[in-house]
């Protein structure tokens, strides 16, 4: 009796494989010889690509809206003012960002934690260069959107005196060249 079950199973598998092969041959024949079928395939591919593009744009807009909402909520909560509170808050937020950054589904939450740490850090420009070396790119991209949305965040280093190198570089870039080729 077991050999009969094996025979039925083999026959069923062979029938399914033959059916699949026959459909593949038929599809290839229609694709090569029927111009209307080819047009229909192209239309279908274009329609699908357009739907995917629209979905990507909508999801990107939704993500931007969520990022803005999270930044606004963080600003409403406020940030510490004393140096001891800032230091503790900074360490807490960086640690939270590192933990959340290990899970790719929590990239926005990790970025928010790094953003909060950036808000209390005395020289945000230096911290961004550290983030650039240690934080994953998707998180950095979201963090960049958060920074771009918040005009109160000054990225340049807090410089207390002497020559402001960033301002000097901007002035030099706007001045005509001397021709030092």
Curated annotation (Swiss-Prot):
Residues 28-181 are cytoplasmic. GO terms for cellular component: mitochondrial outer membrane translocase complex. Its main location: mitochondrion. It is a single-pass membrane protein. It comes from the Eukaryota. Residues 1-5 are mitochondrial intermembrane. SUPFAM superfamilies: Mitochondrial import receptor subunit Tom20. InterPro entries: MAS20 (IPR002056), Tom20_dom_sf (IPR023392). Keywords: Membrane, Mitochondrion, Mitochondrion outer membrane, Protein transport, Transmembrane, Transmembrane helix, Transport. It is found in: Mitochondrion outer membrane. GO terms for molecular function: mitochondrion targeting sequence binding. The chain crosses the membrane at residues 6-27. Central component of the receptor complex responsible for the recognition and translocation of cytosolically synthesized mitochondrial preproteins. Together with tom22 functions as the transit peptide receptor at the surface of the mitochondrion outer membrane and facilitates the movement of preproteins into the translocation pore. Belongs to the Tom20 family. PANTHER family: MITOCHONDRIAL IMPORT RECEPTOR SUBUNIT TOM20, TRANSLOCASE OF OUTER MITOCHONDRIAL MEMBRANE 20. Forms part of the preprotein translocase complex of the outer mitochondrial membrane (TOM complex) which consists of at least 8 different proteins (tom5, tom6, tom7, tom20, tom22, tom37, tom40 and tom70). NCBIfam families: 3a0801s04tom. This is Mitochondrial import receptor subunit tom20. It comes from Neurospora crassa (strain ATCC 24698 / 74-OR23-1A / CBS 708.71 / DSM 1257 / FGSC 987). The gene is tom20.
